């Protein structure tokens, strides 16, 4: 089962991915982690990516997509994978789709978690990250996942706050990219939605991200 996740920052996308990872024993692959791994290992692609990152530039697709494909072809992905954080625009979606097909790798399910921008922003400003696992849900504004004081509600680990999670301008910038249906991340999601509508094996699932973590997870599992 190969699954691609879409959702704005604050939608709980990472949390839902972590739940599916545990339930189905699938690797949860985040594009940022792929960059960090390649750079730390000193791979040829990692070295090229680092040059762009150090300049503050976006890493081009001809570097990013081969990295992602290499990760998806590793042994732990043979029974399936969850990909999160890529693609971020329609061109990347088209390129990823063509690359997977060329590699004889099927994309089975695309999940889009929908959430109002204002709700998403409030969630971001209230979230706290566990030093042991960023996907442990802790949010000072949501009763169901409020942390245990200054400790993670899941494992008791130390909590930290990302500086850009408290920067409204930075949050708005991220959301502007995501919610743009012409050139942004939603344009990538809708590319796959349109593919699924044409028939074939690809399934496109939309979820309301407003309810609690357990409710969203239950709906997601029921639709898979």
Swiss-Prot record:
UniProt-annotated binding residues for AMP: 31, 36, 57-59, 85-88, 92, 162, 174
Record's subcellular location: Cytoplasm
InterPro entries reported for this sequence: Adenyl_kin_sub, Adenylat/UMP-CMP_kin, Adenylat_kinase_CS, P-loop_NTPase
Binding site for ATP: 10-15, 127, 211
UniProt feature coiled coil, ranges: none
Region (NMP): 30-59
One Gene Ontology biological process: AMP salvage
CDD domains, per database record: ADK (cd01428)
Catalytic activity, reaction form: AMP + ATP = 2 ADP
Family, as annotated: Belongs to the adenylate kinase family.
UniProt free text on domains: Consists of three domains, a large central CORE domain and two small peripheral domains, NMPbind and LID, which undergo movements during catalysis. The LID domain closes over the site of phosphoryl transfer upon ATP binding. Assembling and dissambling the active center during each catalytic cycle provides an effective means to prevent ATP hydrolysis.
Subunit structure, interactors included: Monomer.
Protein's UniProt name: Adenylate kinase
Gene name as annotated: adk
């Amino acid at each position: 089962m190969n699954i691609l996740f879409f959702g704005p920052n604050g939608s709980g996308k990472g949390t839902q991915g972590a739940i599916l990872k545990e339930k189905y024993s699938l690797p949860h692959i985040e594009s940022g982690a792929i960059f960090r791994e390649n750079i730390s290992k000193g791979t040829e692609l990692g070295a090229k990516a680092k040059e762009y990152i150090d300049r503050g530039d976006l890493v081009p697709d001809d570097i990013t997509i081969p990295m992602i494909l290499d990760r998806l072809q590793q042994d732990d992905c043979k029974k399936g994978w969850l990909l999160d954080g890529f693609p971020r625009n329609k061109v990347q979606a088209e390129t990823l789709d063509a690359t997977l097909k060329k590699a004889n790798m099927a994309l089975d399910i695309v999940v889009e978690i929908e959430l109002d921008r204002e709700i998403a922003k409030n969630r971001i400003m209230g979230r706290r990250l566990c030093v042991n696992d960023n996907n442990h849900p802790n949010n000072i504004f949501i009763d169901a996942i409020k942390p245990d004081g200054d400790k993670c509600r899941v494992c008791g680990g130390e909590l930290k706050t990302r500086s850009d999670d408290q920067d409204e301008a930075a949050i708005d910038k991220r959301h502007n990219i995501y919610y743009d249906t012409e050139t942004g991340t939603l344009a990538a999601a809708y590319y796959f939605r349109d593919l699924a509508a044409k028939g074939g094996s690809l399934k496109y699932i939309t979820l309301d991200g407003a309810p609690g973590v357990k409710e969203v997870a239950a709906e997601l599992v029921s639709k898979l």
